[in-house]
């Protein structure tokens, strides 16, 4: 008799759960677009403009939207190609054709993480903070590993015009060569000036740079 009571209770519970499941199945689930829109609105409402750090930084261009869309799933080859071609078209080379500056200044830029924060003076030049993600000069022992080592960048690739042009393009807009790269688009986004770009390229490709020793 006790076993019958328990069985009946379990049966009743299962039937109730089934009814709830049926009701849930009849409900209309929010679409991916609706969820994304709500998430974006929630994110935006949690920020406040402060100094030079304005809310316009939350606005995404087409590349950023695509990379966000595929953030947690494999990026299709066709989408990756679309992103790379679109960003390749944005790369601007100096009118005078000079791609290489002073590697000593490039080292300072690579070491500096200043710029674009609300507490930074917008009148001061921004840094690239390269060491946060890359190994460059062997004298610097503190470096990140999110990105590949750039030690001997020019020495391994050759001190050629092709290497210099590639280095400029990569620093200017990394998404042109690797879709959804973690690397900032230093030239495309206006983070570094043209001369700063030259100096960072020099750090990578100048035979006299410590990177190539």
What are these regions (language model features)?
Residues 15, 20-116, 170, 203-213:
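Post-cleavage N-terminal segment of exported redox proteins
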Residues 1-13:
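Bacterial N-terminal signal peptides that target proteins for export
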Residues 116-119, 139-143, 210:
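Secretory-pathway/luminal and periplasmic proteins that interact with or process carbohydrate-rich
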Residues 118-129:
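Local sequence-structure signature of Cys/Sec-based thiol-disulfide redox active-site neighborhoods
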Residues 34-48, 101-105, 131-205:
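Extracytoplasmic electron-transfer domains, predominantly the class I c-type cytochrome c fold
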Residues 94-95, 119, 186-189:
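Generic anion/oxyanion-binding catalytic loop in active/binding sites
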